[in-house]
């Protein structure tokens, strides 16, 4: 069975999670802090309920598969197929009413990411890829005040960017880059980029896959933050690794780029080489 064979099931997971999450968005939802005294790290009833719903559907449909989730941990991590879930990536944006959050659904086969989706139910967008191709499914723009009439699918491709001085750079927040040396490294790249933007969460990576952003730089990521995004970015022609060129699916310090030329320039600055 290939990753493509799971595509319809991933759509079901996205539909189920979206139905759970949307009633909570832009409501008076309570956010708990799970940081234990560190940087505010919210979790909500919507996060937990959506992951529960997805886990239930996976267990019913593929009982031998493993699951790694942000809210409820790991089951059968050594299974041939492992689902990697982040029900709301960007919970800070979610509780602030900003639509840059998304549901991340990743599938690993023998430890390698083979399919991923970022579903944004509020904007009704689904970015998905298998490492060879990546697409966006969204509702076609309506004319006037008429409601959108049908789904539209378009191929995602990263854009050419040969130099940092031409690049648009995204990070969720420099405040989340906790180590002084890492922050200094990030600022070296930001200092040479044409434009820097903050607050994108998972949406920044999909904007990169769609050709609107050239670089995304983050630290302290977990597998559930990045596994789903890897096949989307690679399928769109981009690169995503750790700062030292390693496997991004394990998390840590992450660099994503749409063009290898700007990737190499950014990575040299991140690791202290010019």
What feature does the model see in each segment?
Residues 21, 47, 58, 91, ...:
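Residue-level signal for inorganic ion chemistry
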Residues 48, 52, 71, 87-90, ...:
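Generic detector of well-ordered alpha-helical packing
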Residues 157-274:
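An extended, acidic
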Residues 1-8, 141-151, 274:
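Short, low-complexity, intrinsically disordered N-terminal peptides in bacterial proteins
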Residues 1-88, 261, 268:
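N-terminal subdomain of lithium-sensitive/metallo-dependent phosphomonoesterases centered on the IMPase/IPPase/PAP
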Residues 77-139, 143-149:
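DPxDG-like acidic metal-binding loop motif
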């Amino acid at each position: 069975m290939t990753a493509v064979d799971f595509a319809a099931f991933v759509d079901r997971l996205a539909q189920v999670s979206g139905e759970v999450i949307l009633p909570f968005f832009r409501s008076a939802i309570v956010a708990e802090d799970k940081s234990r005294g560190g940087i505010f790290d919210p979790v909500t009833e919507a996060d937990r309920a959506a992951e529960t719903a997805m886990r239930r559907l996976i267990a019913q449909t593929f009982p031998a598969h493993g699951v790694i989730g942000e809210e409820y941990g790991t089951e059968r991590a050594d299974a041939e197929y492992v689902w990697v879930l982040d029900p709301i990536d960007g919970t800070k944006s979610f509780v602030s009413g900003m639509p840059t959050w998304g549901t991340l659904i990743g599938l690993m086969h023998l430890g390698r990411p083979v399919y991923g989706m970022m579903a944004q139910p509020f904007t009704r967008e689904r970015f998905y890829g298998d490492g060879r191709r990546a697409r966006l499914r969204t509702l076609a723009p309506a004319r006037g005040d008429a409601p959108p009439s049908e789904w539209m699918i378009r191929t995602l491709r990263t854009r050419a960017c040969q130099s940092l001085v031409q690049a648009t750079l995204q990070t969720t927040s420099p405040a989340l880059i906790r180590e002084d040396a890492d922050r200094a490294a990030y600022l070296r790249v930001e200092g040479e980029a044409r434009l820097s933007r903050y607050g994108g969460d998972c949406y920044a990576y999909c904007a990169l896959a769609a050709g609107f952003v050239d670089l995304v730089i983050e630290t302290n990521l977990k597998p559930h933050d990045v596994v789903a995004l890897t096949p989307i970015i690679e399928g769109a022609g981009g690169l995503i690794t750790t700062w030292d060129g390693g496997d991004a699916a394990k998390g840590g310090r992450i660099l994503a780029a749409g063009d290898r030329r700007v990737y190499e320039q950014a990575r040299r600055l991140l690791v202290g080489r010019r």
